[in-house]
Amino acid sequence: MKRSIFKGMMCLLLLGVGATSVYAQQQQRKDTLVVARDGTGEYRNIQEAVEAVRAFMDYTVTIYIKNGIYKEKLVIPSWVKNVQLVGESAEKTIITYDDHANINKMGTFRTYTVKVEGNDITFKYLTIENNAAPLGQAV
């Protein structure tokens, strides 16, 4: 009798631990990350938000980017997938950089502003530009 009570209590304990673990994982799942240059979001630059995305996710994460000019060379690595980068407006949400082929002989292919290596990456309502001076070719 004592053995069956002990087994029953152990089963309940294990079920409780398992349910707590599942609940904690659901609480950690974040579907939207907010980027804002002025500090009103969770991140001040887009690269930080991309780096916060979990590797090889099976659900979609939206990185919402508030209006602003984001001067950064953005790289979305191969292990990042199922991500939407959504700007507040195409006219006022701008990702920009100013590399050109003649800087340290980097060549044209390294002058990107955004490099996407991951799969299922979507961009909406934002502008991506290379605003390099007319000193050399740029992507």
Residue ranges and their predicted role:
Residues M1-Q28:
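Bacterial Sec-dependent N-terminal signal peptides
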Residues Q27-R29, A55-D58, S78, V116:
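Flexible, charged surface loops at secondary-structure boundaries
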Residues K30-Y64:
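Acidic Gly/Asp/Thr-rich repetitive segments characteristic of extracellular carbohydrate-active
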Residues R37-E42, T62, K81-A138:
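Right-handed parallel beta-helix/beta-spiral solenoid domain characteristic of secreted/periplasmic
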Residues R44-A55, Y70-W79, L85:
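Short, T/G/N/S-enriched strand-turn elements that build extracellular solenoid repeat scaffolds
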Residues G68-E72, A90-K92:
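Short active-site-proximal "capping" loops at secondary-structure junctions
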